[in-house]
Amino acid sequence: MARRTIRTYLDSGVLITAYNAAPELKEPVLRVLEDPDRVFLCSPFVHLETTPKALFNKRAGEYRFYQTYFRRATMTNDLKAMLGRGFREAARAGVGPMDALHLAAAHLLKADEFITTEKPSKSVHRSSLVKVVHLFS
């Protein structure tokens, strides 16, 4: 029986944790990143939240890590659709603007999971656009 592919959108905090966190915090991220049953999804917003800071701080290894991830991920560039869906989700669920854009991108990419480091008490978990998963739960 063929295994089901899990369409996975990683929030920026997950990628930052994967590279910068203490080993015990990196473990859950590495399990996700190394899961052969996952296909990764992304938006230009994740790229913007991660890559420029690594470049500014001259952290070449971190920059290469992000670039490797982005080459592997399927990215949407439909800004008009992301902005429209994100606005509606922010108004409906009260999520913050950047989270709304990430959730909209995940929804448009038909993600099965949106994985975040945001605690379950945060507004991103109120969204119903996509299944929101706390990385550390």
What are these regions (language model features)?
Residues 1-42, 54-65, 136-137:
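Short, well-structured N-terminal submotif of metal-dependent ribonuclease cores
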Residues 1-7, 32, 49, 75-76, ...:
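Acidic, PIN/NYN-like endoribonuclease modules and their adjacent C-terminal/linker elements
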Residues 10, 42, 77, 97-100, ...:
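Short beta-strand scaffold positions
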Residues 14, 46, 82, 102, ...:
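Alpha-helix capping/helix-boundary segments
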Residues 26, 47, 63-66, 83-86:
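A general structural signal for well-ordered alpha-helical segments in protein cores
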Residues 36, 93, 109:
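Active-site charged/polar residues at nucleotide-handling catalytic sites that mediate phosphoryl
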Residues 71-92:
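Acidic catalytic patch
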